């Protein structure tokens, strides 16, 4: 039996455990399935080690001492709950352990008791689950002595059931609130501080929660027993009256203080006699607010609350009526004002109150006829008794009225299907002086112990014998003899003797007591009874108790004098008549029922109610008499263990069966688990119920030693077996639901896939029509006047517009937008990287990279500059759309055009953009088709404000791809004919048809499709791994294990004809990647430097090439001295690195190693020839003003390249040295700008006319 531990932090988890209809444990078995769900093992750092054993049936040695030691060990570690099978043993911790929080409560939902540690919530879960699953009424019997924690356990059960019982209807929620509100209300009127318990229940309560067929609470009913009304008029030292008196006197609102004269508790005799006004840790004012709130939740009106508090005030003032003796020894009232106030509160005449307290009206009868009436004065003792009798009667009837009012509010608001009862009654009591109240309390506890014995001990053994189950009988003490001693009439028991004494000598209390003592002599032969002088001893199951005889007969009479009944009958307050509804019948000669008769009838009714339900048990234990946490009195607890019979309970549990059920009910519950008893949820077994039960147990693989078959029932030994059966049953429905869900999901998947395929086809057919339409507008705008580039006519070309993403949120596009200050209200129509021809003083015009952005309002030319090593993006030129007069372009395929503005302050921009036609189209649409597009053999623009200039465009077949601008002329290659249009959109690549769905519920071709092609496709045979061919590779990171495919692993273990005799050697590792070599050159001629930025070289030397310039000079480095400088290109011969030969094939190496031919010394041959060196170029780069930058091969044209691109020209690839090799945005652009500045230094402006 596995048990989980409580997690760290002090909070416990628990689980519900079920019980059968034959009063045995029925586990709910709610687990994840029949087969255990194996999870990956992990280290549970927060898991606590179990303290002792959580179930006493697991003890290696069964004895009272072993049980005590285990309880003590767990108590010291704050583990207060322990199981005996399905019985919960609870030790009162006298402190809050934090184990009743909402999180802990939720952890019990749907759990059986083997999944989490013991807890009172587990009992509540079990009772609620069994009520819903098996439709049986449940009850929870909480037993133990006063102060052991019975009331707290009852409240926690109510808390749990109210939380998990569901129901969203407002009436159901209101019912839950009212049920919970009964706790503070009844506790304030029925609980008090005693020497053993600060919140001792001084009445018994059986709360019956009523549920509908859905397990939702619809009502409740409360039955109260044995209110200790004598506490109203007197308490011993350090005990208190009922809580409500202290709450009312301390926290009564001013309204009640003025209306009822309420003062502090020290002002009243009934609350000050014991000199105890407070309870440690209890705020009476806060408790009074809770009481008022509970009254409101229950539905008490303000008038009803006023009547209740009027009666409480009347009781307090009645206690302050004092008496003195007159000259004749009769009682007289000392303070008439108190009587007047009592009369005001009861709304009766003050003179009648005075007469009722001091005079008794007696009537003589003769021959069955009414005789004379006499008024007999009372002495002070008799007067005090009458006063106290009235106070006790008012409070007793008031408490009954409150219970009835609560029941009226909790009346079921729907059909009641089942119920759960919770019995909370004060436990066994043994005081120094025990009287009639203790006899009644202990008698009820004897009856409860008898139920426990009958249902858990005797009934269990009787059933085993009746069902012919193999069983070893266990001896136990049956306390039925003690119950008979107290309640039997023949032979007369204690109650019968007491009633006889009251009837024989009713006039004199002392005579009645003496008569009672005489009657008790007839019980002296009973071994469980001893009669002593003035007292008698009853040997209860909890121990021997000595009861004092004095005053018992008066308490048993339980009658209110007719004088007091007549007094309250004259009251003008209707609520008083409600409390005392009976009318005084002067002619009734029948003996009214005594208190012992009432308690005996109530106890028998309670037993009958409990026997109709399936009980769960909580046995509470009080660890010490000091109400101190962490204190464990071994002797006291051992005594409780003995009289609660825990040892016998453990022995019977160890030898018994956890679950039993009739054959037909068992088959009805579990027939789904066998394929021979069910099909598709229907019962198909044709044999009898017993054979069906055997078949179910066989098909579920339950071991034979785990169950026995009786005459009418099947007996399952351990709860784990039952939990497994319940789990399998739950899994059956789970599997059925999964099947339905799988079919439905497969259908939804099929429908979705069909829709997707239709949408995909539609998008392929109609997708991008807007972009294609825009592209066709571009063709119409050019109107066959301009040659086209081949890539512009591709069928897949679309006019997408915003290539940089300036209109997007986030990314480089947003940074460009923010840097250029483009308003968020402007729509981005077009963005692209390009170049603008820039003229500077003393220099030639050169193309510079720019970003071209077109919105619905402006054309932005955006520059990116490096300022203090920081990239700054700004708008260099902002042109309103309305200011554009024309756009000028050539009739060749070049990408240059000018935006003619004619501004008197600024020149017109000459722009190079690969997406020129798209720009023209968007600009034309923005101008509503009014764009003046000039196409000629040249480009016109205002180079300076007011100065018109032309740029020649020359077709040069030597220009392979890109345009080049130099000295006012653009050189471009031949293009496609001017009347060319875009090619048709290419058809997508054909792919093999895929099935719409996969799975067995729907065929791959769909619900009406043909057979699956996937099923007919042969599985490829496993192939051996190919041999790896070594080849140069780039440096790789550290190798890690890579799982092989299953086919490859299977092939590696397959013996074939070629590998059966000789095992192939492992493939060699791949060759290490060679380090990249830097370009070098051999010096052909001597060169002596003339300037400081030149490098002197000697013929035959090998120098490293740092960079190459197109003007005839290379920047080289002496590999010996590391000196750098410019050298003539004609003086050098670049060394080409030899291509490495592939590595030889893997072994066996059969071919011999070849000897390479000796290399020719080219340098020596060149030295022998001694040709004349050529003249160095006229121009040399300026070493001081130029930083050497490696020149990579030309990049493809791309105007939508990202800002981290390697192409500094923005994709045009013309006019600007490429230097963007850094990965970062700022670094790449900064490097490009710096390189361009260096390149522009030292140049002459060939066509500058400044």
Curated annotation (Swiss-Prot):
Residues 51-730 form the Myosin motor domain. One of its GO terms (molecular function) is hydrolase activity. Residues 1-43, 962-1079, 1126-1250 are annotated as: Disordered. Phosphorylation of the TEDS site (Ser-372) is required for the polarization of the actin cytoskeleton. Phosphorylation probably activates the myosin-I ATPase activity. Residues 788-978 form the TH1 domain. ATP binds at residues 144-151. Gene3D superfamilies: 1.10.10.820, 1.20.5.4820, 1.20.58.530, Kinesin motor domain (3.40.850.10), Myosin VI head, motor domain, U50 subdomain (1.20.120.720), SH3 Domains (2.30.30.40). The myosin motor domain displays actin-stimulated ATPase activity and generates a mechanochemical force. Type-I myosin implicated in the organization of the actin cytoskeleton. Required for proper actin cytoskeleton polarization. At the cell cortex, assembles in patch-like structures together with proteins from the actin-polymerizing machinery and promotes actin assembly. Functions as actin nucleation-promoting factor (NPF) for the Arp2/3 complex. Plays an important role in polarized growth, spore germination, hyphal morphogenesis, and septal wall formation. Belongs to the TRAFAC class myosin-kinesin ATPase superfamily. Myosin family. This is Myosin-1. It comes from Neosartorya fischeri (strain ATCC 1020 / DSM 3700 / CBS 544.65 / FGSC A1164 / JCM 1740 / NRRL 181 / WB 181) (Aspergillus fischerianus).
């Amino acid at each position: 039996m596995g048990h989980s531990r409580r997690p760290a932090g002090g909070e416990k988890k628990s689980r519900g455990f079920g019980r059968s209809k034959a009063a045995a444990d029925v586990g709910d078995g709610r687990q994840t399935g029949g087969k255990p769900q194996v999870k990956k093992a992990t280290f549970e750092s927060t898991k606590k080690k179990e303290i002792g054993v959580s179930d006493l049936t697991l003890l290696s040695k069964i004895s009272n001492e072993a049980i005590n030691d285990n309880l003590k060990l767990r108590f010291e570690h704050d583990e207060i709950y322990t199981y005996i099978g399905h019985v919960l043993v609870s030790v009162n911790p006298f402190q809050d352990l934090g184990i009743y929080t909402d999180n802990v409560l939720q952890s019990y939902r749907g759990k059986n008791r083997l999944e989490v540690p013991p807890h009172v919530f587990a009992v509540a879960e079990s009772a609620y689950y069994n009520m819903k699953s098996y439709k049986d009424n449940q009850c929870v019997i909480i037993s133990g002595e006063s102060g052991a924690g019975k009331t707290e356990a009852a409240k926690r059960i109510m808390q749990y059931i109210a939380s998990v019982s569901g129901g969203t209807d407002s009436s159901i929620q209101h019912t839950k609130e009212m049920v919970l509100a009964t706790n503070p209300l009844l506790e304030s009127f029925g609980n008090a501080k005693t020497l053993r318990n600060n919140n001792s229940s001084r009445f018994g309560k059986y709360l019956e929660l009523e549920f509908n067929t859905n397990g939702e609470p619809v009502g409740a009913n409360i039955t109260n027993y044995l209110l200790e009304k004598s506490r109203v008029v007197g308490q011993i030292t350090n005990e208190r009256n009922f809580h409500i008196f202290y709450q009312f006197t301390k926290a009564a609102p001013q309204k009640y203080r003025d209306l009822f004269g309420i003062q502090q508790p020290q002002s009243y005799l009934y609350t000050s006699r014991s000199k105890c006004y407070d309870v440690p840790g209890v705020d009476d004012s806060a408790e009074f607010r809770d009481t008022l709130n509970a009254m409101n939740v229950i539905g008490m009106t303000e008038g009803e609350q006023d009547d209740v508090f009027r009666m409480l005030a009347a009781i307090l003032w009645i206690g302050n009526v004092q008496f003195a003796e007159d000259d004749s020894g009769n009682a007289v009232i000392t303070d008439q004002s108190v009587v007047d106030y009592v009369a005001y509160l009861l709304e009766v005449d003050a003179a009648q109150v005075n007469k009722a307290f001091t005079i008794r009206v007696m009537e003589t009868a003769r021959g069955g006829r009414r005789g004379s009436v006499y008024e007999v004065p009372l002495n002070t003792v008799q007067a005090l008794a009458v006063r106290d009798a009235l106070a006790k009667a008012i409070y007793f009837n008031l408490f009954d009225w409150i219970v009835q009012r609560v029941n009226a509010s909790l009346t079921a608001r729907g059909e009641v299907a089942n119920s759960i009862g919770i019995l909370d009654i004060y436990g066994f009591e043994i005081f120094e002086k025990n009287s009639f109240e203790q006899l009644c309390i202990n008698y009820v506890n004897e009856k409860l112990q008898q139920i426990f014995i009958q249902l858990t001990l005797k009934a269990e053994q009787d059933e085993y014998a009746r069902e012919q189950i193999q069983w070893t009988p266990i001896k136990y003490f049956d306390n039925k003899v003690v119950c008979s001693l107290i309640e039997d009439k023949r032979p007369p028991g204690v109650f019968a003797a007491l009633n006889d004494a009251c009837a024989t000598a009713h006039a004199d209390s002392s005579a009645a007591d003496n008569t009672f003592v005489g009657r008790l002599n007839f019980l002296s032969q009973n071994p469980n009874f001893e009669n002593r002088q003035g007292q008698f001893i009853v040997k209860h199951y909890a121990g021997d108790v000595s009861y004092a005889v004095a005053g018992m007969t008066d308490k048993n009479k339980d009658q209110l004098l007719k004088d007091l009944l007549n007094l309250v009958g004259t009251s003008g307050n209707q609520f008083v008549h409600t409390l005392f509804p009976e009318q005084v019948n002067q002619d009734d000669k029948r003996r009214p029922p005594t208190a012992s008769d009432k308690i005996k009838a109530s106890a028998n009714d309670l037993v009958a109610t409990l026997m109709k339900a399936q009980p769960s048990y909580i046995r509470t234990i009080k660890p010490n008499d000091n109400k101190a946490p962490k204190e464990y009195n071994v002797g006291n607890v051992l005594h409780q263990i003995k009289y609660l019979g825990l040892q016998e309970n453990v022995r019977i549990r160890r030898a018994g069966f956890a679950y039993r059920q009739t054959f037909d009910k068992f088959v009805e519950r579990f027939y789904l688990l066998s394929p021979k008893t069910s099909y598709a949820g229907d019962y198909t077994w044709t044999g009898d119920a017993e054979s069906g039960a055997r078949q179910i147990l066989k098909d579920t693989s339950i071991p034979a030693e785990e169950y026995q078959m009786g005459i009418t029932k099947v007996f399952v030994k351990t709860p784990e077996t039952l939990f497994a059966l319940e789990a399998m049953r739950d899994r059956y429905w789970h599997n059925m639901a999964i099947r339905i869900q799988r079919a439905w999901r497969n259908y939804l998947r099929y429908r979705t896939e069909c829709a997707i395929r239709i949408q995909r086809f539609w998008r392929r057919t109609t997708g991008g029509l807007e972009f294609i339409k825009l592209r066709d507008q571009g063709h119409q705008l050019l109107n066959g006047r301009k040659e086209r580039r081949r890539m512009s006519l591709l069928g897949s070309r679309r006019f997408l517009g915003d290539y940089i993403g300036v209109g997007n949120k986030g990314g480089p596009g947003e940074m460009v937008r923010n840097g250029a200050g483009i308003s968020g209200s402007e729509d981005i129509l077009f963005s692209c990287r390009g170049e603008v021809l820039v003229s500077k003083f003393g220099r030639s015009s050169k193309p510079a990279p720019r970003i071209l952005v077109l919105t619905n309002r402006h054309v932005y030319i955006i520059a990116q500059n490096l300022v203090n090593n920081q990239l700054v993006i700004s708008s260099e030129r902002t042109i309103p759309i309305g200011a554009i007069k024309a756009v000028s372009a050539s009739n060749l395929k070049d990408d240059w055009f000018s935006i003619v503005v004619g501004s008197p302050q600024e020149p017109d921009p000459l722009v190079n953009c690969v997406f020129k036609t798209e720009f023209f189209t968007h600009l034309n649409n923005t101008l509503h088709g009014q764009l003046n597009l000039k196409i000629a053999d040249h480009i016109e623009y205002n180079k300076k404000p007011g100065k018109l200039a032309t740029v020649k465009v020359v077709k040069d077949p030597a220009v392979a791809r890109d345009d080049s601008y130099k000295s006012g002329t653009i050189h471009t290659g031949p293009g496609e004919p001017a009347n060319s249009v875009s090619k048709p959109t290419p058809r997508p690549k054909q792919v093999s048809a895929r099935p719409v769905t996969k799975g067995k519920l729907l065929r791959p071709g769909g619900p009406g499709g043909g057979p699956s092609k996937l099923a007919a496709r042969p599985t490829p045979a496993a192939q051996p791994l190919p041999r790896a061919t070594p080849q140069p590779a780039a440096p790789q990171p550290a190798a890690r294990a890579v799982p092989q495919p299953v086919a490859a692993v299977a092939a590696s273990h397959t013996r074939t004809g070629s590998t059966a005799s000789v095992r192939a050697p492992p493939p060699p590792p791949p060759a290490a990647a060679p380090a990249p070599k830097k370009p070098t050159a051999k010096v052909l001629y001597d060169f002596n430097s003339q300037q400081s930025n030149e490098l002197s070289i000697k013929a035959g030397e090998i120098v490293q090439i740092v960079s190459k310039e197109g003007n005839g000079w290379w920047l080289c480095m002496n590999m010996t001295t590391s000196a750098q400088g410019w050298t003539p290109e004609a003086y050098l011969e670049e060394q080409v690195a030899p291509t490495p030969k592939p590595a030889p094939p893997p072994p066996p190496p059969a071919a011999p190693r070849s000897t390479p031919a000796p290399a020719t010394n080219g340098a020596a041959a060149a030295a022998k020839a001694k040709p004349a060196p050529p003249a160095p170029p006229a121009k040399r780069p300026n070493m001081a003003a130029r930083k050497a930058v490696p020149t990579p091969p030309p990049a493809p044209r791309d105007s939508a390249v990202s800002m981290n691109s390697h192409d500094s020209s923005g994709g045009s690839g013309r006019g600007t040295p490429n230097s963007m090799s850094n990965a970062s945005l700022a670094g790449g652009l900064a490097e490009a700008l710096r390189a361009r500045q260096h390149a522009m230094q030292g140049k002459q402006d060939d066509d500058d006319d400044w």
